[in-house]
């Protein structure tokens, strides 16, 4: 079962909400930016990495965190097994 989780990257707290409880496929990601809770989506690609699906919906300072957020998703699910 795929689980929701929180993690910190670069001192910033990210909340991951799964969009599929059986298959590791996509997440809604929430982050506080300038006192506003922002949502963007990450989805798995053919190589098994998670990418931000709409880079315009993710605050620019966090775009560089994409590989770390992908790694956090993969590691969180290994821990849940």
Language model: regions and residue ranges:
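Short, surface-exposed, low-complexity cationic segments
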Residues: 22-34
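Acidic, low-complexity intrinsically disordered segments
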Residues: 37-81
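Exposed beta-strand and adjacent loop surfaces of beta-rich binding modules
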Residues: 2-4, 26, 39
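A short, sequence-level motif marking secondary-structure junctions
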Residues: 18-24, 43-48
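Negatively charged, low-complexity tracts enriched in Asp/Glu with abundant Ser/Thr
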Residues: 1-22
């Amino acid at each position: 079962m795929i689980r929701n989780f929180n993690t910190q990257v670069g001192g910033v707290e990210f909340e991951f909400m799964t969009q599929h409880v059986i298959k590791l496929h996509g997440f809604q990601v929430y982050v506080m930016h300038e006192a506003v809770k922002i949502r963007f989506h990450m989805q798995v690609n053919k190589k098994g990495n998670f990418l931000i699906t709409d880079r315009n919906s993710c605050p620019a300072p966090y775009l560089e965190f994409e590989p770390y957020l992908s790694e956090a998703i993969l590691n969180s699910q290994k821990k849940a097994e």
